[in-house]
Amino acid sequence: MPTDSPDARRTLGLAATTGVGVGAIVGGGILALAGVSFVTTGPSTILAFALNGIIALMTVASFAELGSRFPESGGTYTFARKALTVEAAFAVGWVVWFASVVAAVLYALGFAVFLVPVLQQAFALLGGEAPTWIGGRFALLVYALAAVMFYAWSLMRSPTGGGQWTTIGKLVVFGLLLLGGFLVLVSDLPSLPELVGRFSPFFEDGASGLAQAMGYTFIALQGFGLIVAVGGNVKDPGRNIPRAMALSVGTALAIYIPLLFLIVAVGTGGQSVVALAEENPEILVANAARNFLGAPGYWLVVLAGLLSMLSALQANVLAASSFAATMAADRTLPLRIEGLSPDGRTPAVAIKLTAGMIAFVLVAVPDVAAAGAVSSLIFLGVFALVHGIAYLVRKRAFQPSPYQSPFFPMVPWVGGGLCLALALYQAAAVPSAGVLAALWLAAGAVLFVTHLAPRARVVDARSEGFDPQLIRLRGRSPLILVPVANPENAGVLVKMAEAIAPKGVSRTQLLSVVRPPAKWEDGKLPTELVDAQGILGGALSAAIAVDLRPEALITLSDDPWAEITRIAQRSRPDAILLGIGELHQSIAAGPLERLIDRVSTDIVILRAPTDWDPDQAARILVPSRGGRAQSPIRARVLGSLTREARREVTFLGVLRESMDSSAVRASERELKALARDEARGSGTAVVLQRDDLVAEVVQRSRECDLMILGLRRSGRGRSVFGGPMLDIAMATSCPLLMISQRG
């Protein structure tokens, strides 16, 4: 949930953070799935939950390591964005957002189902008979929608939505249920053989039945992932996120295992637990509680169900809203979804959108069970991915995480493999779940490619420039080629290279091209090579001064520009940084034009005094004719420049005086969007109406420390050097960066 003051958002302590996980995990899963599991595998359901608990704790270890390293909202989406590509991050965020929405739908309907017997009992206490419609589909939808709207409203007022009281209430109810059950067991303690007999046969269908039960019931423990979804709200996240996740799963297991034991030991009413479960698996827990505590036991389960469904609903609405708001901040969802409440504490627009999606699925999707299977499948697949990301990040990261999972790399390998196996089982058991997940992902791919990709890639490029560790975490080591011809320019070029290719992440290759001497003398270096060594020696000295460790290369060629092209085509650098003294038409339309035409890489051209330093660029001017052809490289450069110091970045649009007001407003909106995407927090947009574009930009350039001009490429690798941009470059004297996005 992005805000302008991230520290102010960290309002959740250990107890509140644990409450998010406990609220999402405890109650709903066991009440809905215990009966199905007992039918499938008998008393070994206890073992199935215990084994799932081990898998969950291994997954918690990977989640906790990533959550403490990246204490931001967004959870699994954020992890994918840090370690993979923006496209992969969108895919993860898109499906997990949907999975959380569907989970919220299931819990809203679960609340409605548990509310019906309460209403029926209320009518009975009032001396009347409950009408049949109170349990009909329309009434269930009304109850469910009311719960969704209530939590959406409460979350817009408070980051936690007041759900902690519901969580505390259900823990108290489950505690009373367990206490009552064990008192009954102790008061009428059977002999050991009799007690053991109630658990026989332990396996109803052998190992296959146990595996099936594990596949069915793992979702009863998966809510711990919602903790990292709100990681940006957690105080002292390096300490509290790992503890809260472990406490959440531990609390769930401390309730589930004893409750399952009591169901078999004292809750079957004299028949086998499998027979009792087969009668009505959905309400097995309630029937078992009635058997060992009478009517109070039944109503305790109903109350536990109501509170469990409400707390899980609240946790999923909170997490889904957090996913949506974080994705909007990265432009992997439309920017307007990032909108905050008036006090800046909650993502109001994302909450409204999420509530609307939940309501739509409630009303429009008749087969909610299939949708629930999709949710389970997505979570399992994403959990397997998180294990893989945890492994990659541990291997690639420069600094250790505040929390590191034990037994590395066994935990991510084994945990990821088990989660993947459960996901494949789920896909095979419910084929429609895989189909629905694929359809949702395909719809997202169309949305991303047609609408979201340009802005998302720009923001991602800016993020890589601002935080170079992203490049390292993604397993890349970009190469920057820096041809050096003039020893006086070597220092400023190295400083610029260090700004856009920081040490420890990128590689820099210094290149000096020497014309072959007319005559070689044995035992003596030609003057040309001696001069080249001096040039590279000066560049290397400047590089060492800024702790950069570049490669150095000297080549021989009669045509330096053609040689630069050849080296670029061979080494395939991510960018070429060129330094020029004076820019004139013969260079721009000649060798420079041919170089840009023949290489498929980003081009950065620097014109600056020899004593200039990028740190001096406090005020940056970006003339723009609109469009996003140069946005990714410009965003990356601006991100690099704003990494160490805050800059004032002005995007300048100059329109003809004859342009009508509606076109001016449209241009202003577009330029403001560019400024937000490329220089968030430091960019402003200025739109003027002047007939002399060049004169206006030249006048403004006198007040800036650096100007950035984009050189458009049209067609395959072609640059357009003519027109106003070249005129501006030739008419100004301020430090200048000209950039050209790869073709």
Regions found by a protein language model. Give the residues of each.
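Helix-loop-helix junctions that connect adjacent transmembrane segments
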Residues: 2-8, 45-46, 50, 125-139, ...
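Hydrophobic transmembrane alpha-helices that form the core helical bundles
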Residues: 40, 48, 57-148, 305-326, ...
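C-terminal membrane-solvent junction of multi-pass transporters and transport-like membrane proteins
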Residues: 136-139, 337-346, 383-430
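Membrane-interface loop-to-helix entry segments
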Residues: 136-190, 245-249, 372-385, 411-414, ...
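Intrinsically disordered or low-complexity boundary/linker segments at protein termini
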Residues: 182-186, 447-492, 498-499, 509, ...
